[in-house]
Amino acid sequence: MAAAKLEDADALIDSVETFIFDCDGVIWKGDKLIDDGVPETLDLLRSKGKRLVFLTNNSTRSRKQYGSKFRTLGLTVDEEEIFSSSFAAAAYLQSIHFPKDKKVYVIGEEGIINELELAGFQCLGGPSDADKKIELTPGFYMEHDKDVGAVVVGFDRYFNYYKVQYGTLCIRENPGCLFIATSRDTVFQLNGVQEWAGGGSMVGAILGSTKQEPVVVGKPSTFMMDYIAKKFGITTSQICMVGDMLDTDILFGQNGGCKTLLVLSGVTSHEMLQSHNNSIHPDLYTNQISDLLAVKAATV
Ligand SMILES: [Mg+2]
């Protein structure tokens, strides 16, 4: 069924208890708010007693680091309301009781290492492998740690062949080693100027050399939906998922049984939404989240 344009913001707000917002392309683009109405929109929803949750597939930062980004942008958000795919990787390993004497090899940035260490896991790789190079000289043999029991792969601006080879050796040679992806995002708005290759490109490299499918912990996997619903004791039918990407945010909301609202302020254009090639249809769409303020204007 084709998505309907958001006309009655009041009815939407009244029909749900919790809003889960994606961040890139919804709340901000790079280091700027999507529009000046964002703080007022969040304030309005809070004043109506709505629970707000922020969920990003971007794993470069930890929850704590995202907390300071929200504050820098002038938004009052509690760190407990923020969930990132870096946190999801740690929460997933905890949920399966990943042994604390095993290690995790990280292809990704600081956020993943921070969250894993905060959860008490031993990590290798991450930013410390950023400058490593491999010289394929005759007879060169690369050692790897046999205690690595999981390889976590996320978006990584310092991706290199050393990391690919290290992760590949762990997955192929350590019995039972897990392959975990924080997300498989195609592209995202890193700096607000153009689209940049997302975490899916790093995950694809490891998939290519191991022929293994990863466990995805970020959107559209329902792992974080189940986690958030359980943590706050909410029913997913009482949630509205708000995002700018069809194959991550909207699919995540639909997989979880939520209402879905697509905003056109990020990577998805109106043409892409209406295209015959698109099979993912949100319940509603609108230009930007501050359109939810229409309710306020209408009642004045
Ligand atoms: Mg987004």
Please provide the spans of the model-predicted regions.
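Conserved glycine-rich Rossmann-like NAD(P)H-binding loop of the short-chain dehydrogenase/reductase
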Residues: 53
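Asp-based, Mg2+/Mn2+-dependent phosphohydrolase catalytic module
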Residues: 1-23, 28-50, 59-80, 90-300
